Amino acid sequence: MSATSIQPLLDILFQGKALTREQTASLFSTLIQGEMNEAVMAGMLMALKIRGETIAEISGAADAMRAAAKPFPYPSSKRTEGIIDIVGTGGDGFNTINISTTAAFVAAAAGAKVAKHGNRSVSSKSGSSDLLAQFGIDLTMSPELASRCLESLNLCFLFAPHYHGGVKHAVPVRQALKTRTLFNVLGPLINPARPEFMLLGVYSPELVTPIARVLQALGTQRAMVVHGSGLDEVALHGSTQVAELKDGEIIEYQLTPADFGVPQAQISELEGGEPAQNAQITQSILQGQGSDAHTHAVAINAGCALYLCGLSDSVKAGTALALNTIKSGKAFELLNQLAKVSSETQE
């Protein structure tokens, strides 16, 4: 769309009115094609933020991003097995270990098909991609190879900038604004593998139910949107607020560590460090040699993923399966297999 054709949509926004899903998709399509002036982009993002984005607007922005993404070739088993993503928005302000990334290895080793969509760090010193790079896993592997990894190993990692090139047009504006915008919640919603199941952590409790409603609008089959006592994941140090999407309905409830069959820990016990240090922590957990707090934090998140996939009938049973999978060494073996496949492609 040209500058003149988007002006009526901007006028609606600047009057404090909401856009439809289709109108928002048109605006974001213009943005990611590099056809939006930076001043206009800043005005649009701030108008949305100040009024508060609607479910339709978040869904429309996600529609545009998904449509423009580099395609992901589905593996043949995709026809019968659903894919899950274990992902957080980041930006929760805590520098924890890489819980969701480590949980992805555990869930995959336990039988889930995990396509994890990740980026570099938002709130910690080490994001999903920072950690994987430490293990020699190629972040820019082709979509075809990623699909083969998902098929043969039950796991692949999709590096967001590799699939969503158009986001680069928003970087200068986002950096200049120095405040959260719609982009802070879009990342988890635009996985190019289009997972049927999602465990999605958000940085604010106010986002839990709205983001569940967005996933519902986007056609996600089953999901848990969680905020865990300050963290964008299931909490070991306190209660977790949940909005679960199941059979087209959203149910809201809270979970505590006792619901998973594990003891509560202090948030300080989950503090992470630089990528190299976090890689060592992840390796220890996957080898069955992690601290109780580290191991349990990973297991309760993997347990929720296994519950969502239908591999366990409760989050407690899922956690037990995750702990047994860690103990078996299968998750660490999977890490080595993925690193090996990745290194072979780089030679």
From Swiss-Prot:
Pfam families: Glycos_trans_3N, Glycos_transf_3. It catalyses: N-(5-phospho-beta-D-ribosyl)anthranilate + diphosphate = 5-phospho-alpha-D-ribose 1-diphosphate + anthranilate. This is Anthranilate phosphoribosyltransferase. The keyword Transferase applies. Coiled coil: none annotated. GO terms for biological process: L-tryptophan biosynthetic process. One of its GO terms (cellular component) is cytosol. Anthranilate 2 binds at residue 174. One of its GO terms (molecular function) is magnesium ion binding. Binds 2 magnesium ions per monomer. Mg(2+) 1 binds at residues 100, 233.
